[in-house]
Amino acid sequence: MKYWWAWLLLALSLSGEWMLLRMWLQKKEYSRYDRIIIQAAETYSLDPSLIKAVIWKESQFDTFATGKAGEIGLMQLTDAAAFEWADAAKITTFEPAHLYDPTTNTLAGAYYLAKMRRGFTQCDNPIPYALASYNAGKSQVLRWRDGSGTTNATTFIQQIGFPSTKQYVQAILRQQPKFKADFE
């Protein structure tokens, strides 16, 4: 017990190094798909940090993630959304299993997110509306738009009727600035 403070310093030092290693590995994992994200962002005129934040929230960068309603891959796409992308991209050989491919999934997800954003161009900031549509569907978003929430994104976020969708939108909007530096 004479050197308890030395053991304490050693333990603190090792835990600090573990935290640094964990942060480095996480950053490396989060950057793994940056090239694909940039390609999708350029193709569909989206901010790459937004796409990356959606991937972070939807799948935590797990290409094999599957959702409760059958959503697949990095951006957690449904078959219907993916087939819509494939039709628009004139891909005749598309199959839902292709959604496990990071490039295919990210391109399809970016297409769908850009489509959602285009539906709200009259708003001061269409991104929260697009994210809510991506998560809960456009019909839900149209129900939540009321009064000043029709065009004011801050008011709209407060009017989102599903707590999980409100948290989803807020989490992505908080995370997006953290990913900005990855694309500068």
Describe the predicted segments one by one.
Residues 56-81, 137:
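Cell-wall polysaccharide-cleaving catalytic domain and substrate-binding groove, primarily
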Residues 56, 111-118:
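Short glycine/serine- and small hydrophobic-enriched flexible loop segments
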Residues 14-64, 86, 91, 103, ...:
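Export/targeting segments at the very N-terminus of extracytoplasmic proteins
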Residues 1-20:
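N-terminal Sec-pathway targeting helices
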Residues 129-184:
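Catalytic and substrate-binding regions of cell-wall glycan-acting enzymes that process beta-1,4-linked
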Residues 47-52, 125-132:
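Alpha-helical scaffolds flanking conserved acidic
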Residues 69-92, 107-112, 151:
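Substrate-binding/active-site groove segments that recognize
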Residues 23-27, 37-40, 63-72, 91-103, ...:
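Second-shell loop/turn segments in exported
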